Curated annotation (Swiss-Prot):
A GO molecular-function annotation: metal ion binding
Known partners and oligomeric status: Homotetramer.
Gene3D superfamilies listed in its UniProt record: Nucleoside diphosphate kinase-like domain
Subcellular location: Cytoplasm
Function noted in UniProt: Major role in the synthesis of nucleoside triphosphates other than ATP. The ATP gamma phosphate is transferred to the NDP beta phosphate via a ping-pong mechanism, using a phosphorylated active-site intermediate.
Gene Ontology CC terms: cytoplasm
Native organism: Afipia carboxidovorans (strain ATCC 49405 / DSM 1227 / KCTC 32145 / OM5) (Oligotropha carboxidovorans)
Gene Ontology biological process: CTP biosynthetic process; GTP biosynthetic process; UTP biosynthetic process
Keywords from the UniProt entry: ATP-binding, Cytoplasm, Kinase, Magnesium, Metal-binding, Nucleotide metabolism, Nucleotide-binding, Phosphoprotein, Transferase
Cofactor: Mg(2+)
Family that this chain belongs to: Belongs to the NDK family.
Xref: PANTHER family: NUCLEOSIDE DIPHOSPHATE KINASE, NUCLEOSIDE DIPHOSPHATE KINASE DDB_G0292928-RELATED
Protein name: Nucleoside diphosphate kinase
Record-annotated active site: H117
């Protein structure tokens, strides 16, 4: 198995409900290591850059507003097949369709307030990690 790194965000709906520890417990139970983590208030510029792929979509403004509405926890996760494993642990974007025991099934409020983000590919993970972490902040 390939050891990989992936990027995670615990979103404002989850941090507002003090769920960081609960989400981290699910992540670690799945065998992923949290090798970098910080709680930040995402700026509008950071959110617009991060979600630039959705700029033409009708929900872009609401997404940026949501992601800047409160603190988020940005993380680097590491483990065997970390990208696919974390996507499995997160569950489907729509919490009503997420598998039992996944982060979104347990904690998400709606499709929009779905508690977490995870990278979808190695290339995306590298870009997302670099947007929020300097190399010396990642301690594997």
């Amino acid at each position: 198995m390939a050891t990989e790194r992936t990027f995670s965000i615990i979103k404002p709906d989850a941090t507002a409900r003090n769920l960081t520890g609960a989400v981290n417990a699910i992540i670690e139970k799945a065998g992923l290591r949290i090798i970098a983590q910080k709680r930040i208030r995402m700026t509008r510029e950071q959110a617009e850059t991060f979600y630039a792929v959705h700029k033409a979509r009708p929900f872009f403004g609401e997404l940026v507003d949501f992601m800047t509405s409160g603190p988020v926890v940005v993380q680097v996760l590491e483990g065997d097949n970390a990208i696919s494993k974390y996507r499995e642990v997160m569950g489907a974007t729509d919490p009503s369709k997420a598998a039992d025991g996944t982060i979104r099934k347990v904690h998400a409020l709606s499709i929009g307030e779905n508690s977490v983000h995870g990278s979808d590919a190695a290339e995306t993970a590298a870009v997302e990690i670099a947007q929020f972490f300097a190399g010396n902040e990642i301690v594997g």
